[in-house]
Amino acid sequence: MKQIALDIGLAPEPTLDGFVAGRNAAALQHLRLWSESAARSPVPTYLWGPEGAGKTHLLRAARAQLLAQGADVGWLDIDTPPRTPFNEHWDAVLLDDVHLYDTELQHTAFNWFVNAVAPANGRARPVLAAGLLPPADLPLREDLRTRLGWGHVFELHVLPESEMRAVLRRAADARGVFLSDEVMNFVLGRFSRDLGSLMQLLDHLDRYALQTQRA
């Protein structure tokens, strides 16, 4: 079996196909239909759940799907410069880690949300958002919090670690990759713990092992 080193670089870009749904099948199916449809409903969607449930994976995967279709996408997270204006060319707005937004980012998120869903002129655009808590419990201004709960709301669940390790071990064995306990602990401690991201990382490790074998 192929041995792998710990110097594995960055995890690959998430995809919807790479997300292992588990108890999150309804949310995944919703996002598949949402991102693949040419006429997306402007009804907002909000994903919530604990760290490692796959919220950012799904948002980034949905964004990648939209970009591949030639869409323009507005993306807001804690690294976005405050007061970034809404862009009329956007086809969708994605808001990640909303529970971390400070006052200025909340102002920006509210501005983007209103301009997307209820524009003064032109077509409405969908909003996809994610956070740690259900909408009613978010530490946000009330007008933003209530809007995030307007539409489709999905709670995401994390796989138990024992199941996660078992799935990764089976997937590694199927690829002929020897995944030692040391590497397993490193991966689970260093990278996003949602299973979709981890499975894609395993593909990355497999390619890395092949490259180092050839070197």
Question: Would you name each region that the model predicts?
Answer:
Residues P135-G149:
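Short regulatory helix/loop adjacent to the ATP-binding pocket of P-loop NTPases
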Residues A64-L76:
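Post-Walker A helix-loop "phosphate-sensing" segment adjacent to the P-loop in P-loop NTPases
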Residues P160-S180:
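Conserved small helical "lid"/interfacial subdomain of P-loop NTPases
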